[in-house]
A protein has these predicted regions:
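Structural signature of transmembrane alpha-helices in multi-pass secondary transporters
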Residues: 1-12, 38, 86, 118, ...
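Helix-to-loop junctions at the C-terminal end of transmembrane segments
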Residues: 125-141, 230
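A late C-terminal transmembrane helix in Major Facilitator Superfamily
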Residues: 182, 192-235, 240
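Pair of pore-lining "gating" transmembrane helices in MFS-fold secondary transporters
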Residues: 72-92, 179-183, 192
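Juxtamembrane intracellular "pre-TM" segments in multi-pass secondary transporters
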Residues: 47-80
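Helix-loop-helix hairpin linking two adjacent transmembrane segments in secondary transporters
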Residues: 2-46, 50
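C-terminal transmembrane helical hairpin of 12-TM major facilitator-type secondary transporters
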Residues: 140-191
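Small-residue (Gly/Pro/Ala) motifs that create kinks and tight helix-helix packing interfaces
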Residues: 7-19, 23, 98, 129, ...
């Protein structure tokens, strides 16, 4: 999950390096290379974890039954909703990040570096979660993380909407808030995913697919309108 959180933030830096050396067309070639490497690695190095007696047939009826079981579980439904809202917040920031860095805060030349720095700083969230999850429990950590995000975003909203920040502090305040969003993601998403799969070990593949697909789709439906509301300020993202 740490890799999952960090990759979207580090990706602009990787893309910038590819474009610098081989041009924008090289990005599409990179997709092909990465897909081949990933699929080859899984095929050659990743064994099947389920024992033979627990494996299901790859048939339509079996898949449909597993999907119904997953989607009918109330805990899975609630966790998926929370993940959609959390992903929506992160996707909304990602969709407007370049405009905010370039147009609002005039950091276009350093955008990949700032974004990579944001990813590295927020990665401490996954380390912190790994340290305390057994002591505090997944649910408690998730609740604490979201309350922290409410407080940080609330303070940021007061400062921005009240025009209380001097010019010199506007970008540092935004950067701190953006790091807090990714930090929250690092703390919560792994726990939420584990909570969704907690009682679905026998259909873990289908459960992971359903939770991931539904939460991502919900996040896109949240983030897309927010991105369209961009007005040259950070206000629409804060409201979201």
């Amino acid at each position: 999950m740490m890799i999952f959180i960090l990759v979207p933030a580090v990706a602009p830096s990787i893309g910038a390096v590819i474009i610098h050396f081989v041009g924008w067309r090289g990005v599409f070639g990179a997709f092909v290379v990465l897909a081949l490497v990933g699929s080859s690695w899984l095929h050659l190095r990743r064994p099947e974890t389920l024992p033979p007696q627990s494996r299901r047939t790859l048939g339509l009826r079996s898949l449909a039954g597993a999907a119904r079981e997953v989607m009918g579980d109330r805990q899975v439904q609630l966790v998926t909703l929370v993940m959609a809202l959390g992903f929506g917040q992160m996707f909304a920031l990602l969709s407007s990040a370049q405009q905010l860095f370039v147009e609002t805060y005039h950091k276009g030349a350093e955008f990949p570096l700032w974004f990579a720095g944001m990813a590295l700083l927020s990665g401490s969230g996954t380390v912190l979660n790994a340290r305390y999850v057994l002591r505090l429990g997944m649910r408690r950590i998730v609740i604490m993380a979201y309350w922290m995000q409410v407080v940080v975003s609330g303070v940021m909203m007061v400062l921005v909407f009240g025009d209380l920040l001097p010019e010199a502090l506007r970008f540092p305040a935004f950067f701190f808030w953006a790091v807090s969003v990714f930090f929250m993601a690092g703390v919560t998403f792994g726990n939420l995913n584990a909570m969704a799969l907690q009682r679905k070990g026998h259909v873990a593949g289908m459960a992971a697919s359903v939770v991931g697909a539904v939460s991502t789709l919900g996040a896109v439906l949240i983030a897309a309108p927010v991105g369209q509301l961009y007005d040259g300020t950070v206000r629409p993202i804060l409201l979201a």
